[in-house]
A protein has these predicted regions:
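Short alpha-helical DNA-recognition segment
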Residues: 49-67
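Short, charged recognition helix plus adjacent turn
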Residues: 97-143
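A short beta-strand-loop-beta hairpin characteristic of the jelly-roll/cupin
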Residues: 170-171, 176-177, 182-203
């Protein structure tokens, strides 16, 4: 693991490729997930009695952006998703519910007996096979694969893939929320900026940090990064820079 000072952030930001918001292609995985995610965000907003403008103020974005997310036109970035969930008092995983189609398989390949995804045992254990993971592709080249068959109370467990240039770059608002985060890098090199420190994690390297400390995570390299994250008390943002 290499650690560098915050003085290098401006140079790294200039080297990051620009990310553009685009409408998901009809019938694509992103389109399918966006169509499910948006209505659930809207339903949660209405339950809280918030208007579009009120939620937009909480998230620090435009009402039109919230409308596009709710209508499945675009997917939120990681900072926006955390901010939305915090404003609505929900977890990020709760937006990807069991009835949503799985990201890697068709219903015919899963079979009617739900092979690969068992019901909780008497001891509360749950099993999930790789092909039955639920996948959510966010803005800015970030893909989450949930490693639990159903949302876990107070915890989020997922494999995260960052495309080259993907993630929360130095030019983006930092993320800050309650809890603690644990990360293990499997492939590629991941840059993690926590407070005033910057870490470069290669395969096999890990990091643990307090989620209340403003942080950013991105892939400054030229190959995808695969990592595993465990977030305790995830989704309850306190604010952002």
């Amino acid at each position: 693991m290499r650690r560098s000072s915050v003085n290098s952030l401006a140079r790294d930001a200039e080297a990051m490729p620009q990310q553009h918001t685009s409408r998901p292609a009809p019938g694509s995985e992103l389109s399918s997930v966006a169509e499910h995610l948006g209505p659930r965000i809207k339903a949660a907003r209405l339950r809280r009695g918030l208007g579009l403008r009120e939620l937009a103020r909480e998230v620090s974005c435009s009402p039109s952006m919230i409308s596009q997310i709710e209508n499945g036109i675009t997917m939120p970035s990681v900072p926006n998703l955390y901010a939305i969930c915090t404003a609505l008092g929900i977890s990020t995983d709760s937006l990807v519910v069991p009835e949503m189609s799985f990201g890697r398989t068709s219903s015919s390949s899963r079979g009617q007996d739900g092979a690969g995804q068992s019901s909780p045992s008497a001891h509360g254990s749950k099993h999930l096979s790789p092909e039955n993971r639920r996948v959510i592709t966010l803005e800015r080249g970030v893909q989450w694969e949930l490693l639990t068959p159903t949302p876990e109370q107070g915890a989020e467990f997922r494999e995260v893939t960052y495309a080259p240039g993907g993630g929360t770059s130095p030019s983006d608002p930092a993320i800050r929320h309650n809890g603690r985060e644990y990360c293990l890098v499997l492939e590629g090199e991941l840059t993690v900026h926590v407070g005033f420190e910057e870490y470069h994690l290669s395969p096999g390297h890990s990091i643990v940090f307090d989620s209340t400390t403003p942080h950013r995570v991105w892939n400054a390299g030229h190959v995808p990064v695969r990592s595993v994250w465990f977030v305790m008390d995830g989704g309850h943002l306190q604010g952002s820079d």
